[in-house]
């Protein structure tokens, strides 16, 4: 499967809010390190980046769905066009979505070896990016979040490289199912235990599962999805 590469640096998304969501196509070979693409940056180190969130993949398949969603609701044009890199992804391609990709999947991308570690957790910066106050919530509910990956082996990646599946150790745990267990379904102890015990799932997501099991209440996603009061859109 052919993959497009994107990278970017932190810039001001709106006054007072810096983000590295603005990505540009990578046009020359780039080194993929354990921290991600060499030319890429994460502005919010607390919620982005790190060894388990080195890369973000977003399916190009979804862009037509978003355009249809916008048109069907009669919404104004988004601040950012519906096209690859709009969601701040590093990797994008056609033919692989959250219903097919699985936690723990290992792929060869150029010389690098990468592994799916967790679904993406949408945040309020997407609302500002597109100009829709409920964008992050729709993304979470629809399951069109994309996913994050860790780098198992560093290596060079060329533009328009191909990504090939090497191993799928957990075919029962798709990215979509993983996201639904935490985001979109009632508390299910067996499902939460499955997440907690999966060694390929990121520690952050395993902790979310542990917390829900221990406390019996779902996490409050409001601040992540909507942001501070001063930055909320109607």
Please state what every model-predicted region is:
Residues 1-128, 134, 167-234:
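Electropositive, beta-rich accessory/interaction domains or terminal extensions
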Residues 28, 145-147, 161:
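A short pocket-lining beta-strand/turn micro-motif at the edge of beta-sheets
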Residues 104, 154, 158-161:
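Loop/turn positions that initiate beta-strands
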Residues 133-153:
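A mid-sequence, solvent-exposed acidic-amphipathic segment
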Residues 162-166:
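Short hydrophobic beta/alpha edge segments that flank linear recognition/processing sites
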